């Protein structure tokens, strides 16, 4: 993979992260927004690129397993997501934000292995769940909760 293709994938990571971040910051009003999501997606992409390409031609490395970096991304983003989950007056807050940060890292990993169509479709699905499903929950479940 040449530099231009890597730069294209990293740029797409920033773009797709911003798309999800815009929904979280400006539509949902959450504190984790465009910069956070763009950086999570970018970081996941670049670490995946490193795991794929960074050790090519290194024949003296024993037990090289590129999937270790992918596993590290999942764990690291889980730790980041745990930082946004809080307990406030017996109510857990931040679960959706944590899950969306974790999902966006998957988008970045998909880009890192070159699955651009999957990354775009995944981004669409994340925004759909956050925006449309969230709106439906507020509209119908919120009304149901007020009545009971």
What are these language model-derived features?
Residues 26-40, 62-74, 88-102:
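Short, non-helical or kinked segments that cap or interrupt transmembrane helices
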Residues 1-65, 116, 135-137, 143, ...:
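Alpha-helical transmembrane segments and their membrane-interface boundaries
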Residues 13-20, 68-83:
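Hydrophobic, membrane-facing alpha-helical anchors
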Residues 98-115:
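Interfacial segments of multi-pass membrane proteins
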Residues 125-135:
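Alpha-helical transmembrane segments and their membrane-interface exit regions
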Residues 68-69, 113-125:
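Loop-to-transmembrane alpha-helix initiation sites
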Residues 79, 104-105, 130-131:
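Hydrophobic transmembrane alpha-helices of multi-pass small-molecule transporters
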Residues 91, 105, 123:
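Amphipathic alpha-helical interface segments
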């Amino acid at each position: 993979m040449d530099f231009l293709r890597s730069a294209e994938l990293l740029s797409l990571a920033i773009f797709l992260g911003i798309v999800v971040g815009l929904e979280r910051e400006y539509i949902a009003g959450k504190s984790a927004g465009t910069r956070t999501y763009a950086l999570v997606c970018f970081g996941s992409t670049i670490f995946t690129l490193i795991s794929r390409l960074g050790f090519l031609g290194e024949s003296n490395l024993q037990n090289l397993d590129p999937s270790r970096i992918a596993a590290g991304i999942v764990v690291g983003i889980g730790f980041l997501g745990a930082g946004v989950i809080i307990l406030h007056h017996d109510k857990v807050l931040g679960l959706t934000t944590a899950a969306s940060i974790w999902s966006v890292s998957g988008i970045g990993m998909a880009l890192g292995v070159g699955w651009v169509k999957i990354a775009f479709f995944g981004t669409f699905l994340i925004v759909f769940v956050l925006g449309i499903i969230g709106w439906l929950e507020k509209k119908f479940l919120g009304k149901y909760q007020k009545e009971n």
